[in-house]
Curated annotation (Swiss-Prot):
It comes from the Bacteria. It comes from Lactobacillus delbrueckii subsp. bulgaricus (strain ATCC 11842 / DSM 20081 / BCRC 10696 / JCM 1002 / NBRC 13953 / NCIMB 11778 / NCTC 12712 / WDCM 00102 / Lb 14). Disulfide bonds: none annotated. The gene is recF. The keyword DNA-binding applies. GO terms for biological process: DNA replication; DNA synthesis involved in DNA repair; double-strand break repair; SOS response. The RecF protein is involved in DNA metabolism; it is required for DNA replication and normal SOS inducibility. RecF binds preferentially to single-stranded, linear DNA. It also seems to bind ATP. This is DNA replication and repair protein RecF. Its main location: cytoplasm. The keyword Acetylation does not apply.
Amino acid sequence: MYLSRFKQSGFRNLAPLNLEFDPHVNVFLGENAQGKTNLLEAIYFLAISRSHRTSNDREMIAFGQDFASLAGRVHKRQLDLDLRIVISKKGKSAWVNRVEQARLSKYVGHLNAILFSPEDMELVKGAPSLRRRFMDLEFGQINPEYLYFASQYRQLLQQRNNYLKQLARRQASDQVLLGVLTEQVATAASELIWRRYRYLADLNRYAAEAYRAISGQREELRVLYRPSAKEITAADQPAQIKQKLLDRFAEIADDELRRATTQLGPHRDDLEFQLDGKNAHLFASQGQQRTIALSLKLAEIQLIKQLTGEEPILLLDDVMSELDQNRQAALLNFIHGQTQTFITTTDLDSISQEIVKQPRIFYIHSGQIIEKEEGLNGRRR
């Protein structure tokens, strides 16, 4: 799978673009705050209909514009696809081969993308919200059902929280309605949690292999799901998860009314990374944290290939300078020249020529993008 052409207008500070990409490696060179990250964000948004930087889609519409339009041509083994997504102040709409999609869950998955940014270095020791977002972004693009239940859960959770606030302010008193909302939240939550366990089982295997290959150590990396309802286990089916959630909701009913917010569910769950059984959040060095983060990204590539039969595209946003030669070499070994890769950097010397011997290079300045005629080694393309 690769993205051969990309067009955009009205997205952040980027000038209108119509770019052709190399099927292998594309490098975007420029100083900070010139638009490199915005470009990768735009490509990522075209793929999964969400930003890795903000949950407010309106922020991505350029000042003075009514909408942003992203479009691209995707080449797969069996077919070519034209994708388009438009962000407006009313929402977003998506098309596949000029056919508008009834739901975004029908659109997502036609172009799979893995993005690795400096913020991902915080996955191990950062806030739990970063790890939950990691799961939702990555698992959502490989399974429309996950995306559907995640969207449904967010809507139901907001409704339940709003009603809990009304009860706390004595603006409502219908406990039957609260029971209905609790049942609906537990149903969506159980489906989401069950799928998280399933995907993490495969991700675990690939991440452990990647960690050993990168570090050269015998340390075992494990990724564990930590549900906010401690009674839930990986062996539970959705019906069992739902019942355990309902039991816990009954136990904490008074506390939720007092706090006026939902205390359990996927929005409170977390991931734990362990090295040889020790919590990496507490014990991992900075180098180990970087290796864990890179291992997760490489594991995602393997997982998507396993589930879809296609390599995703890989977006590396200013992270090459964060990786030493060994980690860059490990990255090369895993992508095997089969994964289309987009790299942003302020300095070409930070990128190993063993990884990108003859990339297509673009300069970015003030949102304008032009192609450079020479590769890393100075030879004309």
